[in-house]
Amino acid sequence: TAVEAPITAKNHGVRPDIEANYIAEMVRLELYDTFGDDLYNNGMTVYTTILSERQKAANDAIYQGVLDYDMRHGYRGSIETRIDLIDAPLDEQTQALQDIPRFRDWQTALILSVEETTADARLANGERTTLPWDSIKWAKAYINEDTWGPAPSKVADVLVPGDIVRVRPDIDVEWLLAQKPTVQ
């Protein structure tokens, strides 16, 4: 019967080549001004073109601007601290890290140990890495949106063993301590 049959339906709609939500909204508003509510009721199909290189550049600039702004306003701390994971087997460490939702091409990392100018970490993909001071020194403590603490002078001012943090790929250092931006 139809009730027992597996659901095999899937969306066959057009998939955009690039994220362009603002352009799509601008087009929708223009069409609404022209067609009113008929826009939604008459089965219209609308295609528009943009220069994808410019849109990608705009998206990248906004993304980088948001990250820079968020970093300037301080580090809000680790996702959580799990001291029990430091000596746990590799598969348990990686599973705990993989259970945390991903953000873009970032990784979650478990801080295994902290030295004066470095932190040893396990990434969600199982690799071990060292976070150098240059990847951490930006992380002055966030107090509120208008106030943050002094710049840290050593890694222990920012991280402790057992911290679970996010790191993102960086040109200057392999991995940069990161946090998911909280902008409105």
Task: Annotate the PLM regions.
Residues T1-T108, L112-A124:
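Non-catalytic, structured segments within soluble enzyme domains
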Residues N42-I50, A151-V160, Q184:
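Active-site loop and adjoining helix of the penicillin-binding protein/serine DD-peptidase-beta-lactamase fold
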Residues G126-E145:
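A short macromolecule-binding patch
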Residues Q93-I100, I143-V155:
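N-terminal post-signal-peptidase region of extra-cytosolic proteins
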Residues R54, A109-V114, P150-W175:
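Flexible glycine-rich surface loops and low-complexity tracts that mediate binding to linear polymers
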